[in-house]
Amino acid sequence: MTQRVFQVWKGSNKFILGGRLIFGPDARSLPLTLLLIIVPVVLFCVFVARHLRHEFSPYNAGYAIMVVAILFTIYVLILLFFTSARDPGIVPRNSHPPEEDLRYETTVSADGRQTPSVQIPRTKEVIVNGVSVRVKYCDTCMLYRPPRCSHCSICNNCVERFDHHCPWVGQCIGLRNYRYFFMFVSSSTLLCIYIFSMSAVYIKILMDHQQATVWRAMKESPWAVVLMIYCFIALWFVGGLTAFHLYLISTNQTTYEKLRYRSSHSRSIVYNRGCPNNFLEVFCSKVKPSRNNFRAFIEEEPPRVITLPSTTRESGEAEDENVTRRQKVEDDLDIGDDLMNLSRRCNAEDANNNQPHHTLDIDHERAGSIRTEARHESWGRRSGSWDVAATDVRESRSYATAKDGRG
């Protein structure tokens, strides 16, 4: 059965609706984020906004307080969805290393054997805005990362313009969702300010109606106090995050670049086009389409053959030929040794029986070519070095010459 891309995806992402929505592996944190947004708004509508409906006349303008809170919350949730449920800019991984960047090297072992090997350069230089930038090779995705791209260890993907991995949205923040992430954080900041302000207004109204002190008014509406405390604490996080990313956008940096290259001034100015253009690039440029079609069917890739360079291939063929020749010399020497031992044994038996041996009678011419010296240590070797002693080669040649002379 043919499978789709999302079914065999090698990253750690989670897909729903047949690969139409993509989340990070920690998407289970999303319900907590939803509760932190929805619960305070519900409490605000029930215990604060409901009592302010008739406080602003004419035209019952107090109803607008509740409507604004609800619409603002829906807007924040939509931004959260766009941030966490879409491709952040994942670079498609390769099934094999890029052939145009392969380097073929030959290593020589201790016994003289040459072994060809394939190497991948760890880095290479590219030019960005007239500045040389070093990009790294990713062993997991088997590709050279584009500039400003980094590999997320949580999602196990290379992400373009990688900013960071946010556990609150359960997704990487990259090229295709950074705009929505910033809008989500900044809108959450405004929502906190709105709820805090309206809760404070409600306490002020209670003070005016009852001619009471602030402490008595707070006692009359404890939920308003709880909402003010909650929003004050949340503002330190989302408000600080909004301010930090405003600075990053103005200088066209990412969180990853700011933390890693904080001491490199040249790195920070490579992509800086000026504050107005930097904001236009983030908020007004068209969002690039995804480079992955997660619902596409997988096509079987034909077998891949790596062709070694001619020099490597010729050296390998020469090595095989030398090995064959050495093996032949060793085999010839072993056969000659066995024949000599057989001849000695037969002559000894004939001498004991006082009978001439006709089939293995050795004439004087042939006797000179048979070796009677001690057995060399290189004879009979089956493993180890392929080197053959020079004396063995000379004796083999002399034996072959004598044999040809008799023929």
From Swiss-Prot:
This protein's source sits in the domain of life called: Eukaryota
> Which enzyme class, named as a word?
transferase
Q: Which UniProt keywords apply?
A: Acyltransferase, Cell membrane, Lipoprotein, Membrane, Palmitate, Phosphoprotein, Transferase, Transmembrane, Transmembrane helix
Coiled-coil segments on the chain, per record: none
The cellular location(s) given in this protein's UniProt record come to:
Cell membrane
Reactions it catalyzes:
L-cysteinyl-[protein] + hexadecanoyl-CoA = S-hexadecanoyl-L-cysteinyl-[protein] + CoA
Stretches the record annotates as Disordered: 348-368
Q: Which GO terms describe its cellular component?
A: plasma membrane
* Residues the record marks as active site: C166 (s-palmitoyl cysteine intermediate)
UniProt keyword Membrane present:
yes
| Tissue-wise expression | Expressed in flowers and pollen.
Which residues get modified to Phosphoserine? S385
Any one Gene Ontology MF annotation carried by this entry is: protein-cysteine S-palmitoyltransferase activity
What parts of the sequence cross the membrane?
A: 29-49, 62-82, 181-201, 224-244
Domain DHHC: residue ranges: 136-186
UniProt membrane topology term: Multi-pass membrane protein
Q: Which Pfam families does the entry mention?
A: DHHC
Q: What is its EC number?
A: 2.3.1.225
Q: Where is the composition biased (Basic and acidic residues)?
A: 358-368
Reported function:
S-acyltransferase involved in protein lipid modification.
Task: Spell out the family assignment given in the record's similarity comment.
Answer: Belongs to the DHHC palmitoyltransferase family.
**What is said about the domains?**
The DHHC domain is required for palmitoyltransferase activity.
Q: What is the protein name given in its UniProt record?
A: Protein S-acyltransferase 8
Q: Which organism is it from?
A: Arabidopsis thaliana (Mouse-ear cress)
Q: What lineage does UniProt assign to this protein's organism?
A: Eukaryota, Viridiplantae, Streptophyta, Embryophyta, Tracheophyta
